Amino acid sequence: TLYNKLIELLKKGKQMDKSKEKCAPENMVLSDTERWKNIDRHKAEDYVRKLQARIVKAQREGRHGKVKSLQWLLTHSFYGRYLAVVRVTTNKGKNTAGVDHVRWSSDAAKVKAIDTLKRRGYQPMPLRRVEIPKKNGKKRPLGIPTMKDRAMQALYLMALDPIAETTGDQHSYGFRKYRSCQDAITQCHDVLSRDVAPKWILEGDIKGCFDHISHEWLLNNIPMDKEVLRKWLKSGYVFNGSLFPTEEGTPQGGIISPTLANMTLDGLQSLVQNAVKPYWKPADTEYGRIRIKPKINLVRYADDFIVTAKDKETIENVILPLIRQFMAERGLVLSEEKTKITHISEGFDFLGFNIR
């Protein structure tokens, strides 16, 4: 049964974990600080990396039961929990506390934190909401989880990220390893600098993407522990001393939120490209009769995206209706004010660059 397989995998994981701390002299009792320093980080990273590779392999083979088993093994492993604590105590937000005002600043606190990262009985605390000023004078809400909740998100992200990278859109560049804003701009130039390049651009703008993603869609479609995900989504937030519920969206500030947003928008590229296949036009060439593609390309960086097309009518009559439907299924809408159709001769702004 699946339960027996999980137990067998856990036993194997414990066998691999048994040498997680460097050997100390017999009968010697280590302090918490010494225990933290004695953990072999390279061995931990190697253990997690191998599990992630197995998750990728199982995902590609369509073995979803195996994927779940491996995810469970990773999120319950000592090494996975250790690396989650390492991440939240070494990143930029390590000195920023949540609503409980707790920081894991000492090695002793870190090693004790490892044992607290358990699914059983886990209940996340509300986010501490702050507002960050934007260049346009408006404010962007930022939800700050507690250290423990950040570490739990980091832990489960290790098990989710291999799937996100395996199934992600080819030309999605935001919040992904080894990809950058510059890669997205390079792809735009590659598409638009060809001799027969498309001339029309749809500049897509999603209204409050992170704040409005449907919880129901996330729970039905994100391949991770549903109970843990539900608790994060429904944890609420504290602002000006008052507690507010969260009925939609994934908070900006959570470690796992960018990946959840990316996975929500994955599939958009294939949707628009496949939608125009019926509109491919036959043409006679010196090589024989071929079908001319309508030059549809999508480039996305997080929730910012552009779509290219040969003519304006294709965007208006085919692409835009499909994108609106895609967004509506996920609880999202395009901003009518900021979503524009532009001819390449006019140029367009994307990720801080003007392309023409």
Mark where each language-model region is:
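Amphipathic alpha-helical blocks
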Residues: S105-P124
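Conserved polymerase palm-domain catalytic core
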Residues: T116, R120, K135, T167-H171, ...
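Nucleotide/phosphate-binding loop and acidic/charged catalytic motifs
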Residues: Y156
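Short alpha-helix boundary/capping elements
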Residues: T75-Y82, G93, L160, A164, ...
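Non-catalytic, polymerase-adjacent accessory regions of viral genome-replication enzymes
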Residues: T1-V111
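Conserved phosphate-binding loops in nucleotide/dinucleotide-binding enzymes
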Residues: P141-G143
